[in-house]
């Protein structure tokens, strides 16, 4: 199991690191816990956060991250970074500034957070989804767009994927099981825990399951769900960010 992560809010910590695990639960940092690629070389801001990595159907590796330095303020980021590799060592990268690229739809954005990628088999494309806020009068919602064939940009302006009825939603993570798509997310500023919505379609129709799924009374974020190899167990991991550790929970459904 490969875990992509960043370590904190200092600019030296806002960089992509890797860790490995044999069991999906206990991880060992690689490269002496140092970044595997320079944030300054791949981003507009000089820092990257919230990395997510996907092994594609084509055998390549796709990674996305928030282009942000938190010292500039939590409402300061305007885009994301896309990366692609065949060997997990050598990466090509591209930056997307949303106000510049999509001025009509996203000219006023002040948060483009926690992008992730999933393969949409129905169209044979990689879908990138993230939370976006269009300025201080808006709240965070989940949007999606398809990456272009070279994974250097988006085919079109992102479309709305999930709106939690006026409540901010960040850190979306989608997994498919038995033909259904489960969208896990953080209830940002309104409970600060992990809930999910479910749909029969990847790109529409998500219905909220209105209960918290994390097993912690503290605020958590950055949820990620994956299946343990050769088992029926699924792990929901999340960042107990006020206490500086990750927690892992298991489920079979």
Predicted stretch roles:
Residues 1-253:
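Carbohydrate-active catalytic/glycan-binding domains of CAZyme proteins
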